[in-house]
Amino acid sequence: MELDICSLGNALLDVQFSIDDNFKDQLKELSIPFGLMTLIERQEQEKLINKLKAQYGEPLLDCGGSATNSLIAASNFGSTCYYTFKVSNDNAGKAYKENLLFNNIRHEVQTSKLNLPTGQCLVMVSPDAERTMCTYLGVSSSLNCEDLDNSAIKNSKYLFIEGYLVTSQSALEASIKAIKIAKKNGVKVALSLSAANIVNSFRNEIRGLI
């Protein structure tokens, strides 16, 4: 199996709302920085989603996550892609896997004994197209070294790591191991920095990946 890109990342279902400028004030009241990604708990996210539904109606749902978006784009341009991630056996997880197959992305989905749902990213898009994201990682945060497909990494031209993985200790350790395997086998490594607040908050962890 020869691949162009092998990647690991947070598998998140995108829940997207188009908001108006007035909602920016409500975000400020909730201490959610406009234009950035903030990690929140499940109950907080559900409460905010219900608030948005009341004001803007039903959201758009789609397969998301930083690495996923990059792989879908690469696949649509003809690259052979492979993805390692974690979702639950819930409706969101099933829809996620179906979307990857639709986009011709080979994948190894890992199951977890943890009673956690598939992760979700609440995306609020303002009139000027700026995105504010509130993410609940769910089961994706349990991605670990045992989930890696060493063969897929070795047989790829590139290993792509999304910077958001540094927010989970087990995912960070998996990223470090994957990079070591890649470098040992002459596979080029690409790392996204994801967001300014991720770099500021996890500077040492990101340096550890370089």
PLM region spans:
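Anion (oxyanion) recognition and catalysis
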Residues: L3, S75, L101, K180-K184
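Hydrophobic beta-strand scaffold residues
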Residues: C81, H107, V189-A190
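Glycine-rich phosphate/adenosyl-contacting loop at the front of the ribokinase-like
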Residues: M1-Y82, K94-A95
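Conserved beta-alpha-beta core of the PfkB/ribokinase-like small-molecule kinase fold
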Residues: Y158-I210
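Cofactor-binding loop segments of dinucleotide-utilizing enzymes, especially the Rossmann-like FAD-
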Residues: L8-N10, K86-N89, S112, V125-P127, ...
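A glycine-rich helix N-cap at a beta->alpha junction
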Residues: N99-L116
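Conserved phosphate-binding/catalytic loop of the ribokinase/pfkB sugar-kinase fold
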Residues: E108-K113, V123-Q169
